[in-house]
Each structure stands twice: as structure tokens, then as C-alpha cells.
């Protein structure tokens, strides 16, 4: 089992601390949420783990491998997959070519193995019928499936999902939740940050709540819902799953 650890992360902008001493862990085969009010520091924390935002203090570790100084692309090679909120599909490439764009840079696979892996991913995510479709022609739900399949083409240990429920219709939300559960069941560790707290908590085993740059709660969804501090600053008294 692999473990992704963010330890004592801190970040300041122009002298103002936006993240202070935040720690979290994600294990293989579990779904973890990183949530909080707008401006709480959760997105900055998430981006420090991904490698988009440099941390001022703290460490990012996969098992015993400290990757704190590595850029995003190097972290990807160590096992961190990242799916941004914005559409990241190559619009003028087919679904097949989108997958091969990642598989081609994997020097651990032969040409035949890359072809086999592309076919496996299309079958796994039920996008075989879209093989020759251009990225720009896909629906929101189809695009998300292709983007997740492409992220898995890099063979990550963990996948970090930025706002996976944003900009998709209710049917697609259900579909994405099933995909996230499938990723967990496949042995990946999944970290989600999303403004849709209801859908995120519904799919998580654990969650971390950040407010004003500090970690204020950590636990199961039930524990989070019962936390009085979380109710006061984030969820309110009447929130229910």
C-alpha cells in the first residue's frame, strides 16, 4: 500500500499566511476530500500537493520519497496523477490519440503494450465507441471519462481531482461518482477538492476541512457533519447528506 503525505504545509502571499501548518494523508484504495469555505486555503493546499504552487514550508512525501522540490511533471512520474477543473482534453485529437499522447512517453511499454493499454482504458471507461471522435465533439460527461482514462495512462498511484463535479449535469455527477469509486476499487488513492460539498462527502471515506488557512477538522463524513466548529464556519446547522 502506498501513502501520499502532505506534512505541515504553509504558504504566504505578500506577507499574508493563506495556509498554516496543514497536514493530510491519502492511502491507496481510499477517497479523501479536501474541503472548506471559499478563500479557506484548500485550493492552495491542493495545488501545493499537485506541484502547481510552491510551498513555503512543509513536505510532500510518497511513502519514503520526498517529492517536495519536484515540479508537476516530475511528480507525475513518481505517481501523482492530476485532473484539473478546466477541460484538459486535446480538442483536435481523437479519443484514441488523446490516450496515446500520454502512453507514447512511457518508456516502460513497447509499442504493442501501448496499443493494448489504450484499448484496455477505452474498454474500462466505456469509451470504445468514441475511439475516433474528436475531443471537441464530446459531451461534458464523455470528456471527463476520457480525461480520467488519460490520467490513468500514466500509471499513477494517486489521482488528484480538482472540482470533478463542476460543470456537469446531474446524470453525469452520478456517473463521475461511480468512476471515482472504481478508481478507489482499482487500488488508487483519490484526493478530491470541490465546492460541491454534498457530492464530495457522499463519495469520501474521510475528509479534511480547512478554514482561514488552518485545518479545523478531519474524520469520516459522519464525524464531519457532527463537528460543531465545522457547522459554525462552513456547513451550517441544517446541512444533511
Swiss-Prot record:
Pfam family, one: BCA_ABC_TP_C
InterPro entries according to UniProt: AAA+_ATPase, ABC_AA/LPS_Transport, ABC_transporter-like_ATP-bd, ABC_transporter-like_CS, BCA_ABC_TP_C, LPS_export_LptB, P-loop_NTPase
GO biological process: one example: transmembrane transport
Keyword Transmembrane: no
Gene null: resulting phenotype: Results in an earlier growth arrest and onset of cell lethality.
Protein name per Swiss-Prot or TrEMBL: Lipopolysaccharide export system ATP-binding protein LptB
Species of the source: Escherichia coli (strain K12)
Protein's membrane topology: Peripheral membrane protein
PROSITE patterns: ABC_TRANSPORTER_1 (PS00211), ABC_TRANSPORTER_2 (PS50893)
Compartment(s) of residence: Cytoplasm; Cell inner membrane
Gene induction: Transcriptionally regulated by sigma-E factor.
Function of the molecule: Part of the ABC transporter complex LptBFG involved in the translocation of lipopolysaccharide (LPS) from the inner membrane to the outer membrane. Probably responsible for energy coupling to the transport system.
Domain of life: Bacteria
Amino acid at each position: 500500500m502506498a501513502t501520499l503525505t502532505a506534512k505541515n504545509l504553509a504558504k504566504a502571499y505578500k506577507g499574508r499566511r493563506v495556509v498554516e501548518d496543514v497536514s493530510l494523508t491519502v492511502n491507496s484504495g481510499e477517497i479523501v476530500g479536501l474541503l472548506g469555505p471559499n478563500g479557506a486555503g484548500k485550493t492552495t493546499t491542493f495545488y501545493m500537493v499537485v506541484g502547481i504552487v510552491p510551498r513555503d514550508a512543509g513536505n510532500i512525501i510518497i511513502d519514503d520519497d520526498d517529492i517536495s522540490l519536484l515540479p508537476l511533471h516530475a511528480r507525475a512520474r513518481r505517481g501523482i496523477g492530476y485532473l484539473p477543473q478546466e477541460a484538459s482534453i486535446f480538442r483536435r485529437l481523437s479519443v484514441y490519440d488523446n490516450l496515446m499522447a500520454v502512453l507514447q512517453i512511457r518508456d516502460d511499454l513497447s509499442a504493442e503494450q501501448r496499443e493494448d493499454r489504450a484499448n484496455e482504458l477505452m474498454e474500462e471507461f466505456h469509451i470504445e465507441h468514441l475511439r475516433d471522435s474528436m475531443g471537441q465533439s464530446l459531451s461534458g460527461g464523455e470528456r471527463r471519462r476520457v480525461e480520467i482514462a488519460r490520467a490513468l495512462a500514466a500509471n499513477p498511484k494517486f489521482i488528484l481531482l480538482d472540482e470533478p463535479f463542476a460543470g456537469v449535469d446531474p446524470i453525469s455527477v452520478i456517473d463521475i461518482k461511480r468512476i471515482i469509486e472504481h478508481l478507489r476499487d482499482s487500488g488508487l488513492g483519490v484526493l478530491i477538492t470541490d465546492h460541491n460539498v454534498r457530492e464530495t462527502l457522499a463519495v469520501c471515506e474521510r475528509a479534511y476541512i480547512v478554514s482561514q488557512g488552518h485545518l479545523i477538522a478531519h474524520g469520516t463524513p459522519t464525524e464531519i457533519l457532527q463537528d460543531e466548529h465545522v457547522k459554525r464556519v462552513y456547513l451550517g446547522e441544517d446541512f444533511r447528506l
